[in-house]
């Protein structure tokens, strides 16, 4: 049996994780700023998550949501103070793309309209509906025709928002475009977007699969912009390392959904509910959101101090512990050098080194990562100069 590698192979066999670190099969320790593309924001093998999962495993592991469970009730109680504004309802799923699919379906049903608007350089997933609102043609074109009609507007361009009209069911937006280069939305753009969707009766869907649950220094990244969306997708960090996603909805939308409108065999399973319960406790008890905000500013400051003299560094940007270093060249060489220096990061867009650090990252870790990034970028510059 052969494993089909659909992601780039990093050439490492990882056998253990703890907090902000992972170890390979030879025992080499790495600082993990990749975190499974942002999943391990609460750290690898978080003790409270393990405790809740272990306890639940002794009782029951899987069950249809047709049946109630005490752990789901506990999860709802613990998550309640963290829920997005005015969203008292949740659909429980497994992966980010599932949450996006549910959001698109919900928007079409609620509005009775078909047209969806997304943004250039967006990424929302690889299943058929989510792929339809993902910009990268390399992902989309082999599988077309997909869901339609879908129109892509320019991110952060207020003038183009006039294309959101009375035929639009929903607009889906990332508050920070992660896959495309850690590009934050402008506040005036987000406010104009909210105003235009309300004006024409379209739903505003904020995709927070990567940005949500504390990573950007707010529980939800939309809170940086002074708006409230109609629907919000969450995933990655919300399960503390366990596969969970969710669609959050306000009452006025939830009350219009009927049995059979959506479903998920594993969604809301007891193990997932245990993971979200624990993750919610960690977020509150460890002041994770505040830590992400403070540490993110420290990290960006250190990066700027270490990298400001390098001519190929264009910009260091992001919010909280979602940080991008834009350089003049593709980051493959730099990422390999960083890996050799025992720091794991990942690519974003065509020229960005992306850091998705766990909240327990220390200043010493930040120094180590910044030094590794410097070495990697210098190596990139040298090789580019030669070739």
Curated annotation (Swiss-Prot):
Recorded hits in SUPFAM superfamilies, A to Z, give: PLP-dependent transferases
Reactions catalysed, semicolon-separated, are: [amino-group carrier protein]-C-terminal-gamma-(L-lysyl)-L-glutamate + 2-oxoglutarate = [amino-group carrier protein]-C-terminal-N-(1-carboxy-5-oxopentan-1-yl)-L-glutamine + L-glutamate; [amino-group carrier protein]-C-terminal-gamma-(L-ornithyl)-L-glutamate + 2-oxoglutarate = [amino-group carrier protein]-C-terminal-gamma-(L-glutamyl-5-semialdehyde)-L-glutamate + L-glutamate
Q: Which InterPro entries match?
A: AcOrn/SuccOrn_fam (IPR004636), Aminotrans_3 (IPR005814), Aminotrans_3_PPA_site (IPR049704), Class-III_PLP-dep_AT (IPR050103), Class-III_PLP-Dep_Atrans_LysJ (IPR053458), LysJ (IPR037537), PyrdxlP-dep_Trfase (IPR015424), PyrdxlP-dep_Trfase_major (IPR015421)
Query: What CDD domains does its record include?
Result: OAT_like
What does the Swiss-Prot or TrEMBL cofactor note state?
Binds 1 pyridoxal phosphate per subunit.
Gene that encodes it: lysJ
What PROSITE patterns does the record tag this protein with?
Answer: AA_TRANSFER_CLASS_3
According to its UniProt entry, this protein's organism is Sulfurisphaera tokodaii (strain DSM 16993 / JCM 10545 / NBRC 100140 / 7) (Sulfolobus tokodaii)
EC primary class: transferase
- Name one molecular function that GO assigns to this entry: transaminase activity
Tell me the protein family, please.
Answer: Belongs to the class-III pyridoxal-phosphate-dependent aminotransferase family. LysJ subfamily.
Q: How does it assemble?
A: Homodimer.
- Tell me a GO biological process for this protein: arginine biosynthetic process via ornithine
Top-level lineage group: Archaea
Annotated substrate binding lies at 126, 264
Q: What EC number(s) are associated with this protein in UniProt?
A: 2.6.1.118, 2.6.1.124
Location in the cell reads:
Cytoplasm
Role, per record: Involved in both the arginine and lysine biosynthetic pathways.
The organism's lineage is: Archaea, Thermoproteota, Thermoprotei, Sulfolobales, Sulfolobaceae
**S-S bridge residues:** none
Cofactor(s) needed for function: pyridoxal 5'-phosphate
Q: Which GO terms describe its cellular component?
A: cytoplasm
**Could you tell me which pathway this protein works in?**
Amino-acid biosynthesis; L-lysine biosynthesis via AAA pathway; L-lysine from L-alpha-aminoadipate (Thermus route): step 4/5; Amino-acid biosynthesis; L-arginine biosynthesis
Q: What is this protein called?
A: [LysW]-aminoadipate semialdehyde/glutamate semialdehyde transaminase
Concerning Pfam families, the annotation shows: Aminotran_3
């Amino acid at each position: 049996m052969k494993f089909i590698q659909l992601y780039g192979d990093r050439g490492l066999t990882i056998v253990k994780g703890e907090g902000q670190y992972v170890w390979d099969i030879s025992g080499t320790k790495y600082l993990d700023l990749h975190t499974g593309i942002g999943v391990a924001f609460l750290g690898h093998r978080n003790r409270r998550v393990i405790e809740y999962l272990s306890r639940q495993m002794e009782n029951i592991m899987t069950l249809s949501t047709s049946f109630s469970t005490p752990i789901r009730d506990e999860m709802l109680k613990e998550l309640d103070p963290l829920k997005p504004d005015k969203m008292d309802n949740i659909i429980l799923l497994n992966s980010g793309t599932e949450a996006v699919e549910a959001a698109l379906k919900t928007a079409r049903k609620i509005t009775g309209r078909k047209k969806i608007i997304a943004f250039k350089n967006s990424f929302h997933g690889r299943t058929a509906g989510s792929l339809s609102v993902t910009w990268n043609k390399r992902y989309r074109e082999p599988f077309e025709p997909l869901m339609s009609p879908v129109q892509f507007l320019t991110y952060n361009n207020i003038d183009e928002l006039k294309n959101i009209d009375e035929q639009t069911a929903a607009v889906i937006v990332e508050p920070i475009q992660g896959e495309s280069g850690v590009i934050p939305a402008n506040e005036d753009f987000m406010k104009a977007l909210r105003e235009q969707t309300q004006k024409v009766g379209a739903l505003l869907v904020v995709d927070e699969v990567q940005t949500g649950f504390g990573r950007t220094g707010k529980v939800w990244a939309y809170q940086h912009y002074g708006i409230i969306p109609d629907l919000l997708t969450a995933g990655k960090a919300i399960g503390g390392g366990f596969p969970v996603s969710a669609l959050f909805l306000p009452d006025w939308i939830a009350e219009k959904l009927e049995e059979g409108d959506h479903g998920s065999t594993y969604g809301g399973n007891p193990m997932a509910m245990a993971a979200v319960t624990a993750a919610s406790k960690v977020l509150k008890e460890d002041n994770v959101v505040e830590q992400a905000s403070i540490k993110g500013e420290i990290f960006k400051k250190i990066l700027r101090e270490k990298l400001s003299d390098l001519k190929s560094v264009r910009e260091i940007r992001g919010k909280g512990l979602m940080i991008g270093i834009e350089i003049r060249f593709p980051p493959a060489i730099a990422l390999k050098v960083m890996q050799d220096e025992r720091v794991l990061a990942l690519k974003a867009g065509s020229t960005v080194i992306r850091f998705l650090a766990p909240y327990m990252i220390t200043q010493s870790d930040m120094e180590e990562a910044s030094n590794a990034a410097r070495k990697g970028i210098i190596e990139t510059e040298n090789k580019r100069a030669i070739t």
